[in-house]
Amino acid sequence: MQPKLTAKEVVFISDLMNLEESVAKKATFYSKTLTDATLANEMKTIACNHAKRYAVLLGLLQ
């Protein structure tokens, strides 16, 4: 069972979620537009890592 979060903590987590989502979207976009395969794969990895962090943060709010 997770402890109750304060309103300030919820706002902080929500802000972090917005940032993680934004970076994941940007990295996904870059992975599709880069012509260098190595850089494109690195951007895919970065996007995946940020998506995982987003999911973890979402889990804290549920």
Show where each model-derived region lies.
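His/Met- and acidic-residue-enriched segments that coordinate or traffic transition-metal cofactors
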Residues: 1-62
